[in-house]
UniProtKB/Swiss-Prot annotation:
GO cellular component: a single term: cytosol
Species of origin: Roseobacter denitrificans (strain ATCC 33942 / OCh 114) (Erythrobacter sp. (strain OCh 114))
The TRAM domain, residue ranges: 379-441
Catalytic activity: N(6)-dimethylallyladenosine(37) in tRNA + (sulfur carrier)-SH + AH2 + 2 S-adenosyl-L-methionine = 2-methylsulfanyl-N(6)-dimethylallyladenosine(37) in tRNA + (sulfur carrier)-H + 5'-deoxyadenosine + L-methionine + A + S-adenosyl-L-homocysteine + 2 H(+)
Name of the molecule in the record: tRNA-2-methylthio-N(6)-dimethylallyladenosine synthase
Protein residues bound to [4Fe-4S] cluster 1: 14, 50, 84
Subunit structure: Monomer.
Pfam families xref list: Radical_SAM, TRAM, UPF0004
PROSITE patterns: MTTASE_N (PS51449), MTTASE_RADICAL (PS01278), RADICAL_SAM (PS51918), TRAM (PS50926)
Length: 441
């Protein structure tokens, strides 16, 4: 009997890539592969890549250079590149690294079985099309194996915003939303397999406009309310959002929907109106702050996170100070900051660049402010009672680890709860990146 071939997938970048890697794995497992934890043990290696910054793309080429040596020990090893680098660079990947056998873009994952068949015939395989068929509907049904208690579920893909710094519209395409019934079917399937929390994913998820059973388009808020009715699903989150698509019904859902968690990732990128205009964000710092105020009126305890780019072309010290002022005004529980990375083909790539040393210095300053806010908010949690979804054992005997409604990592000592339980606890200590808690009687 022939031993099954082994598959190793390494995932870079966003949560949607994590979801996509799961679906690619399922497609290939259905063709007889089994997953392995190490590249050295694999018969096929897939790198699911991110192209949002230059550094991320170069990491992929560095990893390909390392992995090609494995072919000397296993001549039948197949090496593939998926994701946004694959979409953006296509056959250039094979030219730059001839050891690569397969290149597949994000819209063609459902074609992996056919591409794998070409590999078995001795050919290379390349597919970076935007095919007319829906990849979500073409992918094989998910296996019924038990899942971790938290799961991602892609409901929307692509972006029509065309921010001046971003490659997503070029690598993921125009905005597409999955039909409500398909999302609900997948959510129920996940719940049957042990999932208690689902995070809805999209490059611009609050622009969701999937068709409902009545044929009419539904908003993200309407989808969330439909998910709220699924027995066994206890928590709902969504990411990533654009301020311009934060409509009234979604703000009201944060106020009223019992299963929608009090956490919102709402990137703004800059606090300078001048830079926001150059970024093509189509909102101002003031409109963003007024939106935050409206959200907090409905849900005062909501924890906010954001994204910031420093060193965007033509950014001055005054522009940067405006960003610091906005961060101070919002008080983020989490925020992610990045130095601007030139992406070929985007409008910002042609503009005057900020001195790299100055951009590095600004990045350090913004990260110091973000860290202080995060630690202050974590410290404010001490003494509060929260609910923790238990996800895994901790490092110490009797310790379990999970996350609160606010997405804080929480360690619970002397805990008899099982993975998947939702446990009331009291926070007793704020650590650097997590909280410590005790169970409530």
């Amino acid at each position: 009997m022939t031993a099954p071939k082994k598959l190793f997938i390494k995932t870079y970048g966003c949560q949607m890539n994590v979801y996509d890697s799961e679906r690619m794995s399922e497609a290939l497992v259905a063709e007889g592969y089994v997953e392995t934890k190490t590249a050295e043990d694999a018969d096929m290696i897939l790198l699911n890549t991110c192209h949002i910054r230059e550094k991320a793309a170069e990491k992929v080429y560095s990893e390909l250079g390392r992995l090609k040596s494995l072919k000397a020990d296993n001549p039948d090893l197949k090496l593939g590149v998926a994701g946004c680098v694959a979409q953006a660079e296509g056959e250039e990947i094979m030219r730059r690294q001839p050891a690569v056998d397969l290149v597949v873009g994000p819209q063609s994952y459902h074609r992996l079985p056919q591409m794998e068949a070409r590999l078995r015939e001795g050919h290379k395989a390349l597919d970076t099309d935007f095919p007319p068929e829906d990849k979500f509907e073409e992918l094989k049904a998910r296996p019924k194996a038990r899942r971790a208690p938290s799961a991602f579920l892609t409901v929307q893909e692509g972006c029509d915003k065309f921010c001046a710094f971003c490659v997503v519209p070029y690598t993921r395409g125009a905005e597409v939303s999955r039909p409500v019934t398909r999302v609900l079917d997948e959510a129920r399937d996940l719940v049957e397999r042990g999932v208690r929390e689902i995070t809805l994913l999209g490059q611009n998820v609050n622009a969701y406009h999937g068709a409902g059973a009545d044929g009419n388009e539904k908003t993200l808020a309407q989808l969330i309310w439909a998910l709220n009715d699924i027995d066994g699903l206890e928590r709902i989150r969504f990411t990533t959002s654009h301020p311009n698509d934060m409509q009234d019904d979604l703000i009201e859902a944060h106020r009223d929907c019992p299963k929608l968690m009090p956490y919102l990732h709402l990137p703004v990128q800059s606090g300078s109106d001048r830079i926001l205009k150059r970024m093509n964000r189509k909102h101002t710092a003031d409109s963003y702050l007024r939106l935050i105020e409206r959200i907090r009126v409905g849900r005062p305890d909501i924890l906010l996170s954001g994204d910031f780019i420093v060193g965007f072309p033509e950014e001055t010290e005054a522009d940067f100070q405006a960003t610091l002022d906005l961060i101070e005004a919002v008080n983020y529980g989490y925020a992610y900051s990045f130095k601007y990375s030139t992406r070929p083909g985007t409008p910002a790539a042609e503009r005057a660049q900020v001195d790299p040393v100055e951009a590095d210095e600004r990045l350090q300053r913004i990260q110091a402010l973000i860290t202080r806010q995060q630690q202050d908010i974590q410290q404010s949690m001490v003494g509060r009672d929260v609910s923790v979804l238990i996800e895994k054992p901790g490092r110490f005997e009797g310790q379990m680890v999970g996350k609160s409604e606010y997405l804080h990592a929480v360690h619970v000592d002397q805990c008899s709860a099982q993975i998947g339980d939702i446990l009331p606890v009291r926070i007793v200590e704020a650590k650097r990146n997590s909280l410590a808690a005790v169970t409530l009687a």
